[in-house]
């Protein structure tokens, strides 16, 4: 982060702030610009790496879940982080069901037919938290090169809508 006159500039790199006054000034600047701030929560780990989940929902169904892993805090796959299989997680069935229900509820609440829901499992709690809702599912290679379930189901839904099954 750098300052140009009276406003902050994005340097397009991750920096860690620890000084509360600097954090407060930056937070005020970000909110003044109309952006949203997220509360920091410590992510659960898988084999020593932080992870969160992208849950791809289609109406009342979960089509795919990808585990996004990183040594750092940011897990986005376009930043060359690792995609792992949902089956690799040792989550209890009740936790899996809860994250599915919350993801579907978020999709419904926003009136979306498709959504990519980012879910964080808080470290040492097994509690899923929705941290972001994206208006499209996702471009997940794990699915594309196996079942291709995400796009196949989207096409079926669209065909159903055009055939009068609204």
Label every model-predicted segment.
Residues 57-59, 119-123:
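Short, low-complexity Ser/Thr-rich regulatory SLiMs
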Residues 52-54, 116, 130:
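Broad gene-expression machinery/nucleic-acid interaction feature
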Residues 80-101, 105-114, 121-166:
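C-terminal active-site "lid" helix and adjoining low-complexity regulatory extension at the edge
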């Amino acid at each position: 982060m750098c300052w140009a006159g009276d406003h902050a500039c994005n340097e397009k790199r991750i920096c860690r702030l620890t000084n509360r006054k600097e954090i407060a000034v930056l937070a005020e600047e970000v909110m003044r610009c109309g952006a949203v701030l997220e509360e920091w929560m410590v992510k659960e780990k898988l084999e020593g790496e932080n992870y969160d989940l992208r849950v791809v929902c289609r109406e009342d169904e979960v089509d795919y879940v990808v585990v996004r892993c990183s040594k750092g805090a940011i897990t986005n796959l376009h930043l060359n982080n690792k995609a792992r299989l949902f089956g690799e997680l040792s989550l209890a069935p009740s936790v899996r069901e809860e994250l599915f229900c919350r993801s579907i509820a978020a999709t419904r609440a926003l009136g979306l037919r498709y959504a990519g829901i980012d879910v964080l499992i808080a470290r040492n709690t097994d509690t899923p938290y929705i941290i972001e809702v994206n208006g499209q599912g996702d471009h997940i290679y794990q699915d594309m090169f196996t079942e291709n379930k995400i796009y196949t189901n989207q096409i079926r839904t669209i065909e159903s809508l055009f055939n009068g099954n609204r």
